[in-house]
């Protein structure tokens, strides 16, 4: 068993709240996608607020800013969930459901197995990407870094570009 797991944050700003017709498709899929995440190979944890998701959490003063965080056993398990399982079909609606961001909206980083990242950790990883690009501390699927005991150059990957953080 690895001593490291991979953490992921994905943020977005919705054009309207839960009752807005423009984002109804997002909310209609939310429970199904979360249930799929919970049983996906390699799944360890996902951020949950008062309900079954993180929608009620307010990581910033903006009530339309949403955060999703998860931890998986390894980068391949996370990649397969995001890009190869049913989640990818839902992410195709991202342009309709979320405003375009001029900053990084997704970051990955390694955490010690058993540790869970905080919202502050996640927001700081996005800041690192915006200010310094991919590094061992925060990276993307396109510039993936190996686990800390084997840090070296980024491993270039080629996932669908419409669903990747900016850095």
Can you annotate each of these PLM segments?
Residues 1-63, 104-167:
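Short S/T/G/P-rich N-terminal loop/turn motif that feeds into the first structured element of a domain
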Residues 62, 75-104:
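An amphipathic, aromatic/His-enriched active-site/gating alpha helix that lines ligand/cofactor pockets
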Residues 67:
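A basic- and aromatic-enriched beta-loop-alpha substructure that forms the phosphate/nucleotide-
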Residues 72:
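Exposed, tryptophan/tyrosine-rich binding patches on extracellular proteins
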């Amino acid at each position: 068993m690895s001593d490291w797991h991979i953490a992921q944050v994905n943020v977005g700003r919705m054009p309207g709240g839960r009752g807005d017709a423009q984002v109804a498709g997002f909310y209609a899929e939310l429970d199904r996608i979360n249930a799929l995440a919970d049983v996906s190979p390699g799944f360890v944890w996902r951020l949950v607020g008062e309900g079954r998701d993180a929608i009620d959490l307010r990581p910033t003063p903006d009530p339309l800013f949403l955060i999703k965080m998860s931890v998986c056993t390894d980068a391949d398990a996370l990649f397969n969930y995001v890009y190869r399982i049913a989640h990818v079909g839902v992410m195709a609606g991202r342009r309709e459901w979320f405003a375009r961001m001029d900053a990084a909206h997704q970051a990955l980083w390694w955490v010690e197995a058993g540790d869970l990242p905080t919202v502050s950790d996640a927001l700081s990883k996005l800041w690192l990407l915006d200010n310094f690009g991919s590094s061992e501390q925060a990276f993307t699927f396109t510039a993936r870094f190996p686990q800390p005991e084997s840090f070296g150059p980024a491993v270039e990957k080629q996932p669908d570009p419409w669903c990747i953080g900016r850095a």
